[in-house]
Amino acid sequence: MPENKKMNGLKYFYTRLGKPAQHIMTSPIPTAIVGAYMDTKNSAKRIEGFIRRNHIDLTDYIESKYRCFNDFFTRQVKPGARPIDPAPDVLISPCDGHLSAYKISGDSEFAIKDSYYTVDDLVGGDAIADEYMNGTCLVLRLAVDNYHRYCYIDDGFKSRNYHIKGRYHSVQPIVVHRHPVFKQNTREYCLLQTKNFGTVTQIEVGACMVGKIKNHNEAGVIHRGREKGMFLFGGSTIVLLFKQGVLDIPEELFEATLKGEEATIKYGAAICKKA
């Protein structure tokens, strides 16, 4: 389907007339059905067309015969294709994606266009908002042509994973800018006690037709650049919350975000330095 038709369809879902269809399509049932199908051998026949429609470059990926579509979707890169920035005082990107940066207010609030959030909204009401007053929120949106595995941003220790049940709205900007997706969608989060960046909250957000957020480990020691997990079928999002004074983010990144611009970044690449 042409991209403009997809965008028009998404716009319609978020109108008054489209609301009944939106309610059905963002419920867990369609996503569970599609996710189950993408684990079947029959789904492998969809791989070739998906590559062609989305102009996916497979140069960086290990050649493989995929058993099902999800095997393809979570395909691994070749050794060295996603180098980890070696400087320990550099914040690395946990994933391929499109980066936006937001300043968290003294009330632990921030806005993404017309959608307003508190820190507690993102983690299902847990009272951690005070820790992130005047801090920074980084949002990394993964598209369908990105590498769908993600890594730890630093050495340290992680908490257990907390799962929050929710809906499955699209994470396309046209939806995120109009609808409070990140406090309604299914998501998982954990607290990272990091060596260089203090306590960081990392949130993986499910999206329309994402079958599963698959994190590998529960509580324990973590290592910078080591794989943390993966998203199965569909694009999705990672949100990182940092305390005040931790990051030295160029003001230009915040300004670009306010203009609706995203920075393209790769897994393991430098985002900024610590303050």
PLM regions with names:
Residues 1-275:
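Contiguous, well-folded functional domains in the mature portion of proteins
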